[in-house]
Amino acid sequence: MLNNKIDFSKYDPKLWFAIEQEKKRQENHIELIASENYTSNYVMDVQGSQLTNKYAEGYPGKRYYGGCEYVDIIEELAIERAKKLFNADYANVQPHSGSQANFSVYTALLNPGDTILGMKLSHGGHLTHGSSVNFSGKMYNVISYGVDENGEINYEELLRLTKKYKPKMIIGGFSAYSGICNWKKMRFIADNADAYFVVDMAHVAGLVAAGIYPNPINYAHVVTSTTHKTLAGPRGGLILAKNGDDILYKKLNLSVFPGAQGGPLMHVIAAKAIAFKEALEPKFKTYQKQIVKNSKVMVERFLEKGYKIISGHTFNHLFLIDLTNKKITGKDADIILSKANITVNKNTIPNDLKSPFITSGIRIGTAAVTRRGFKENEVSRISDWITSILNNVDDHNNVLQIKKKVLEMCLKYPVYI
């Protein structure tokens, strides 16, 4: 196991070195990538258990291999906890990732060439919502909706496109949107075309579990998610549904296995079970509330410093900074901030004129820093450090001075040590 329990530094020094350096990086960097988080020691320990040895094709009670009596218990625990956490009556915990979950749902409900309607990647959507470089953009006829001039989902455009193109599926959810989605309105629009409404809540699953972001389960035909990000579990996928029928649930199960995957990763499913248990505890809700508080404080601080925030606010764990008026690209901001041990990611903004490899913005998320104990005071200071660096990109001494402050803060709030 890699959490300092077995020393294999002499057996494989190159691998040991890389892992040790990554552990140090996580301890000594302020992590503001919105899709990243720190999982618990319980989750990491379970993922390094003997469960990694077990093949278990099929579902509990219906396996293709023998010796599955204990992994059946584990998967059933994960399923029941997921259903309880999100108020669902169906859960599939086998998808290896969020993208795999989406692929499985699409292939269960659609035929190749069907029309889908998803959020533009450049406006905050995800690759799997219809990007031309992704399977979703290759297998299906894609129509895209976006945000309006205020950075909010354009529901009028969504309704107009739905009436015009009659999609088989409308996809809700995002990877870079700081607002609250009106799931009820989106389901109403989907019903106008007799379309499936599928929600990818990967980014806000933790907030949904804590009851501080609207739960799509009562409006979507199917909900997908990752189990990391704000949920703070292992890297993996999840499919949920409510008020469906056995025909739908059977389609979904068959689409995951044998449709998209073979054997499930039982060590990861066990880690999901532990993460769901953690998310059912009262302190998880406190953590999620603090994530949003920290996000709002950072937005307010950036606005005070003259920075433009897409939509001008945040109601979740993330927000986008438009750097156009700062004469710096997202790529360059990413690079210069990393020199001070502050990790962000470059991100396109709505109607961006720059390529996704350059971008005019950066995305900031507060799930990871909140996990290590940062509160309003700390994230306010971090916002000041970021603006100081971006306002003086050629002042290398300033970067070094801020890096020292970053290291001091990280030492005060360790992740694992």
Curated annotation (Swiss-Prot):
The record marks 228 as: Plays an important role in substrate specificity. SUPFAM superfamilies: PLP-dependent transferases. Its main location: cytoplasm. It is an enzyme of class 2 (transferase). Its EC number is 2.1.2.1. It catalyses: (6R)-5,10-methylene-5,6,7,8-tetrahydrofolate + glycine + H2O = (6S)-5,6,7,8-tetrahydrofolate + L-serine. Homodimer. HAMAP family: SHMT (MF_00051). This is Serine hydroxymethyltransferase.
